Amino acid sequence: MWKIQTALEKDIQAIARDLGGRLAPDRRPVLEDKVARYIRKPDRTLFIALDESRVIGFSTIIEDPEIRGDLTRETVGSLQGLAMITGLLVEVNYRRQGIGQALVRAMEKWAFNRGGKGVWLVTREQAAWYRRHFGYREMERIVSDGVQKTILAKTRISASK
């Protein structure tokens, strides 16, 4: 049975080992460095999904990110004070078991417990999943580097509906 927990310094190598298996060997240190930065900075966190001691998924969130990109002024204003989900991954063999949902709920709880107004994210293909399972609402669609992306958000108010 799997479980969700906050990643700690001692988890860095296991995360890189278990989730970096498909990366070229020279890319694993890059992953390890990125994971370490998420764990060490106080304004962000990394959650991991574990099956026994094997890391099978992760999610990352930043409390008060710098909002960049080609967003309208209205969208930027709406996203102020919201934490940003910056990553979500579940190993292929573990998908459709509720792990992704548990990781998203852990991030939302983290943001709300820190006094945040809500959370937002950018997605290419999973917008319907976030709307259906968590009540996220579409803020804006953009094209970045030729790829269509959807900006979604969920606030305390929309969470209670």
Positions of PLM-derived features:
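Conserved hydrophobic beta-strand within the GNAT/NAT acetyltransferase core sheet
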Residues: I85, V119-V122
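Hydrophobic adenine-recognition pocket in adenosine-nucleotide-binding enzymes
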Residues: A7, L88-V90
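Conserved N-terminal entry element of GNAT/NAT acetyltransferase domains
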Residues: M1-K10, S158-K161
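Conserved acetyl-CoA-binding loop-helix of GNAT-fold acetyltransferases
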Residues: V90, R96-K109
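Conserved acyl-donor/pantetheine-binding loop and adjacent beta-alpha core of acyl/acetyltransferases
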Residues: D26, L50, R54-G87, R95, ...
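Conserved active-site alpha-helix within GNAT-family acetyltransferase domains
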Residues: N113, K117, R124-Q148
